[in-house]
């Protein structure tokens, strides 16, 4: 697992149109020691924030108005490019097999269904961030 000192350097972008969901996710992340957290209620701003913030992990809701998580997942995956790995974790209340398959096919690295177990969620976040760090180290 990652050393605690590495947590403060990791940047997390959380995109969800529900303020209560953002608050819960941020509370769990902050409790785990993450401090570089950006949140977005409006998925239309996600590409701009992604490019400016350069996150190490994106946490993305699927069911949002106007621009849904699937369309955004596709856009963000194309922005990362082939020579970079920015994992995307999907957070969704949709437990259908179709939703999971579609999100994974579009590039999601993990899927967590709401409501989620906070301990499991924290472990999954840490695992994806460790993957990101290993990828960055390998590129050096």
State the predicted function of each range.
Residues 16, 61, 92:
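Active-site residues of response regulator receiver
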Residues 19-38:
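Two-component/phosphorelay signaling modules centered on CheY-like receiver
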Residues 20, 42-45, 63, 68-74:
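Acidic catalytic/metal-coordinating carboxylates
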Residues 23-27, 71, 84, 95-110:
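Alpha4 helix (beta4-alpha4-beta5 surface) of REC/receiver domains from two-component response regulators
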Residues 39, 65-66, 92, 96, ...:
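The feature encodes the CheY-like receiver
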Residues 39-57:
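Acidic, metal-coordinating helix/loop segments flanking the phosphotransfer/catalytic sites
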Residues 48, 70-83:
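Short amphipathic alpha-helix used as the core "switch/output" element in two-component signaling
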Residues 98, 116-129:
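C-terminal output helix
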